[in-house]
């Protein structure tokens, strides 16, 4: 994956840590953003769906028509190339579905939910279920008590296998499992998520993740996935399991992998603090994320990779205004804005090695600020 893409903000020192309250307010940041950045156009938003869908169809057509007739050595190279390209484009569509959940697609909530439901269901994601848990994450980012996901553990609570596998081969194994199965395991078992009094997942309408008024839509999300699975069953009957796996299954798994890598890197970095209830507030939490540079993939992924800090502050800004809004608020954020342009594979390895558990900030009277550390 890419690194070293273009942008106006220079790389900040890796170990720079800012945990004091910012000298500005959300209102100050909002006033710095040009008003048109908050405008959502259903026509412009729909253009990106059509654009991505056409490219996805072209990739599908080429893979279905030509890869099977290639000689074996070339086919073994062509399939992984198709999987990467198709997964990249489908992740872009997933990002648009995610924007629908933030009401950033159009001025009409029903349009946003309809589009998001279709896109996410096709990509095997329970739209409403994830929308609601993701809303909780945005409301409580980096709160050790209330955040919904990516909640780090203290040194004493780190699983034994992390200690046993604290070497390069073991780290590779953990990374492989984390980045391939992390999102499905989170949806099914709430792994790395907020601890509830009973078992929680994204498919049970009675899960403690959801409020009473949300339960019907959680069921609707399940029905959407069942409809897609029925379509997969028909495709398997018509074309065979191997064809469906290669054309659809592996690219969707690739979407999950992209999601895991992107969100992990957005929320895992030595410069990102976590807070307990004595120190946390919404603005502090929203600023405790970091932008990443995925090179040429930034545009393919609709800039979700390097506008994440802005997104946590103003999640209803559509992606086609995100870079302009980011640059506008950076004049106010100053050192409170974080971006790391380390090449992505290198960053993944470094974070997996350095960010194992959290410890209280040293030299403070309050113990409410925590930082990543390693064994």
Swiss-Prot record:
GO CC annotation terms, alphabetical: membrane
Extent of motif Histidine box-2: 134-138
Gene Ontology biological process terms in this record: unsaturated fatty acid biosynthetic process
Pathway: Lipid metabolism; polyunsaturated fatty acid biosynthesis
InterPro entries, alphabetized: FA_desaturase_dom, Fatty_acid_desaturase
Keywords: Fatty acid biosynthesis, Fatty acid metabolism, Iron, Lipid biosynthesis, Lipid metabolism, Membrane, Oxidoreductase, Transmembrane, Transmembrane helix
Annotated membrane topology: Multi-pass membrane protein
Predominant subcellular localization, coarse grouping: membrane
Motif Histidine box-1: positions: 98-102
Transmembrane segments: 54-74, 77-97, 110-130, 172-192, 218-238, 242-262
Cysteine pairings via disulfide bonds: none
Entry cofactors: Fe cation
Recorded GO MF terms: acyl-lipid Delta(12)-acetylenase
Pfam families xrefs: FA_desaturase
Motif Histidine box-3 positions after renumbering to this chain: 308-312
Expression sites (tissue/organ): Seed.
Keyword Transferase: no
Catalytic activity: a (9Z,12Z)-octadecadienoyl-containing glycerolipid + 2 Fe(II)-[cytochrome b5] + O2 + 2 H(+) = a (9Z)-octadec-9-en-12-ynoyl-containing glycerolipid + 2 Fe(III)-[cytochrome b5] + 2 H2O
Subcellular location: Membrane
Function description: Changes the delta-12 double bond of linoleic acid into a triple bond in the biosynthesis of crepenynic acid.
Entry domain remark: The histidine box domains may contain the active site and/or be involved in metal ion binding.
Recorded family membership: Belongs to the fatty acid desaturase type 1 family.
Name recorded for this polypeptide: Delta(12) fatty acid dehydrogenase
Protein species of origin: Crepis alpina
